[in-house]
């Protein structure tokens, strides 16, 4: 039986691109911080409109083996669960927390898909009302 491979999204690899995304919107979650920035907002970068994803795992998450495992899990979660949800012309940087190493893979995918989708005005208003209580 032949299984169709899903295409990996483009990766962010340059420091300047990571720093540019840091100025964008931040969406916090229990397993990671997702930084999102539209490339139209980033001046001077001329590239085809494809979605790009970068991964950051800091040294406080453990030794190199643990950090690499977290990155592999996140890369696979993006490939399997999010290739249809990510917006073309947008850069995403996932800053992992140490909990991403031991979280169930299905939970990792569901958290990523929840954070990737932009909030509507109605959801933002509801969240604002909850913070005021």
UniProtKB/Swiss-Prot annotation:
This is Ribonuclease P protein component. Consists of a catalytic RNA component (M1 or rnpB) and a protein subunit. The keyword Transmembrane helix does not apply. It is an enzyme of class 3 (hydrolase). It holds the Pfam family Ribonuclease_P. RNaseP catalyzes the removal of the 5'-leader sequence from pre-tRNA to produce the mature 5'-terminus. It can also cleave other RNA substrates such as 4.5S RNA. The protein component plays an auxiliary but essential role in vivo by binding to the 5'-leader sequence and broadening the substrate specificity of the ribozyme. The lineage of its organism: Bacteria, Pseudomonadati, Pseudomonadota, Alphaproteobacteria, Hyphomicrobiales. Its EC number is 3.1.26.5. One of its GO terms (biological process) is tRNA 5'-leader removal. One of its GO terms (cellular component) is ribonuclease P complex. It comes from Bartonella quintana (strain Toulouse) (Rochalimaea quintana). GO terms for molecular function: 3'-tRNA processing endoribonuclease activity; ribonuclease P activity; tRNA binding. Belongs to the RnpA family. Keywords: Endonuclease, Hydrolase, Nuclease, RNA-binding, tRNA processing. It catalyses: Endonucleolytic cleavage of RNA, removing 5'-extranucleotides from tRNA precursor. It comes from the Bacteria. InterPro entries: Ribosomal_Su5_D2-typ_SF, Ribsml_uS5_D2-typ_fold_subgr, RNase_P, RNase_P_CS.
């Amino acid at each position: 039986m032949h299984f169709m491979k899903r295409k990996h999204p483009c990766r962010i690899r340059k420091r300047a691109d990571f720093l540019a995304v840091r100025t964008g919107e931040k969406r916090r979650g229990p397993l990671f911080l997702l930084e999102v920035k539209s490339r139209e907002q980033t001046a001077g970068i001329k590239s085809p409109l494809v979605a790009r994803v970068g991964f950051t795992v800091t040294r406080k998450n453990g030794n190199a083996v643990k950090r690499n495992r977290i990155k592999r899990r996140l890369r696979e979660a993006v490939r399997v669960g999010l290739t249809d949800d990510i917006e073309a012309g947008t850069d995403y940087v996932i800053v992992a927390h140490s909990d991403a190493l031991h979280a169930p893979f299905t939970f990792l995918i569901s958290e990523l898909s929840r954070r990737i989708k932009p909030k509507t005005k109605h959801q933002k208003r509801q969240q604002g009302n909850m913070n005021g209580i």
